[in-house]
Amino acid sequence: MMNYSKKIMLMLVTASCLLVACGPTPQQKLEEQQRLARELNDSINRLMMTGDSAKIFDALALNDQLLQLDTVRENQFRYYMQRVSMFYQLGRDADAFEIQEKAMVLLPEDNYDRLNYFAIKNEKLGNTEKAEFFFTMALEACDEALEHGAGKDALINKAAILYYQGKKDEAHKVIEDAYLQHQDDEDLKSMATGSGIWDEIEASTQKMKAIKLEQPAKTDSIHKH
C-alpha cells in the first residue's frame, strides 16, 4: 500500500506536469503552489497527531517537500517549528533544539524568542558572556514589547527567561506586579495566585536544561541514529 510520502510525491509530480502542459499564468502557478502547500501541511498534521514514530518519519519527509515548495519567510518559520515539534516527539531533543535555529534566524533580530534561543544556545556551548548578553537583550525586548501593549505572551516570556536563569523570585514578581496593575484580569489573577503557569515554566526549564549540545552540531537528518 502506497504510504503518505509516496502519495504526496505522486500528487506533486502530476500537478507539475499539468502546469507545464497547460501553460498556466503566474497567478495560477501561485494558487496551485498554495493549494499543494496546504495539502502537504494537512497531511503532516494528521501524521503528527498519530504519535506513531513511523508516521512521524513520513511526516518529516513531507516537511522536507513543504520547505522546498513554499519559500515564503513566515511560512518557512512555521514549517521549521513544525519540524522541531516532530523531533521532540521522536525524543531527539538536541536535534530539535539545533533545528530550531533555522526558524529563529527568520525572526527579526530584536525578537525576544530569537534572543532567548541564542542566549540558551551560548550558555550550553559555554559562552557565558555571550549568553548573558543575549539574556539581557531578550529581557529588554520583552520590556519594549510590553510597553507597546504586546500582551501576556511577552509577560510570560519575561518570567520564563528569569526563571530559567534561576531568578525565580524575580520571575514571580513580574507576574504579581502585572496583576496588581490589572486586578480585574482573570488570566493574570490565575497566573499570580495559581501554580499552573509555573508548573509549565518549570517543566519547560528542566527539559531545556537537560539538552546537551555536541560539537560539531548534529545535522538535520530524518534518519534514526
Model-derived features with residue positions:
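Alpha-helical solenoid scaffolds that mediate protein-protein interactions
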Residues: 59, 63-66, 103, 138, ...
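Sec-dependent bacterial lipoprotein signal peptides
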Residues: 1-22
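N-terminal leader/linker segments that initiate helical-solenoid repeat arrays
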Residues: 22-75
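Structural signature of alpha-solenoid helical repeat junctions
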Residues: 35-36, 55, 74-78, 110, ...
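Alpha-helical adaptor scaffolds
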Residues: 77-155
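Terminal, low-structured helical/coil segments at or just beyond the last alpha-helical repeat
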Residues: 168-225
